């Protein structure tokens, strides 16, 4: 695992979200949730975009053979809730290959199997109807949209019980530095309030609000 990915595994999405706000970056994927609150993922995006099926039907899930261990499959199904693009077979292959997890702007199915294999899937929802003959892969390895957030191949994806955030790779070091600073301030505030300092005083003393405010 890359050192920077390992560092991000230790920071929750709430703190990273605050760091993104501080830097004026939209990276929070609204509505994308974990199918188990116990999962935490961090890795680089392998992007896939689906579109409506054409007259000459294309592939649905063969791209999984090209995903590297440690990567996160990021699927743009344009937020469709009426058919799935991920189920038990894909889950089994991904788990066997050592893929870190899957993020879908759309739905998954075979949830019991996903939970049984303990393979992290983050999605808009769950629905049993197949995507076969309804959608097909339009592109692989190009920029996609997840809940209106742009994701490019290689961007860092973080997911946990509170949702999913996207970190553009060109500013990943800066986001990490700000997140660590915010995390440190929050730790100091907790310690100070446990010793009797008021929350207002602690937040002021450790410049907490400025750490979350863009441009300050």
Q: Where are the predicted features?
A:
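C-terminal binding/interaction regions
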Residues: 157
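Feature captures the catalytic cores and cofactor-binding loops of soluble hydro-lyases/lyases
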Residues: 1-153, 167-200, 204-216
């Amino acid at each position: 695992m890359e050192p920077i990915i390992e560092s991000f595994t230790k920071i929750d999405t709430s703190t990273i979200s605050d760091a993104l706000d501080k830097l004026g970056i939209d990276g929070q994927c609204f509505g994308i949730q974990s199918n188990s609150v116990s999962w935490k993922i961090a890795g680089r995006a392998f992007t896939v975009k689906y579109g409506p099926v054409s007259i000459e039907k294309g592939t649905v899930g063969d791209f999984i053979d090209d995903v590297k261990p440690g990567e996160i499959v990021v699927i743009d199904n344009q937020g469709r809730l009426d058919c799935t693009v991920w189920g038990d077979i894909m889950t089994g292959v991904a788990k066997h290959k050592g893929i870190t997890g899957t993020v879908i702007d759309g739905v998954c199915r075979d949830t019991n199997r996903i939970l049984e294999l303990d393979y992290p899937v983050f999605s808009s929802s769950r629905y049993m109807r197949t995507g076969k003959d309804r959608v097909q892969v339009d592109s692989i390895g190009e920029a996609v949209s997840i809940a209106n957030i742009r994701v490019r191949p290689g961007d860092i994806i973080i997911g946990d019980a509170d949702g999913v955030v996207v970190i553009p790779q060109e500013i990943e070091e800066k986001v990490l530095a700000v997140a660590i600073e915010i995390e440190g301030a929050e730790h100091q505030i907790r310690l100070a309030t446990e010793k009797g300092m008021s929350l207002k005083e602690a937040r002021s003393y450790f410049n907490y609000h400025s750490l979350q405010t863009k441009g300050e």
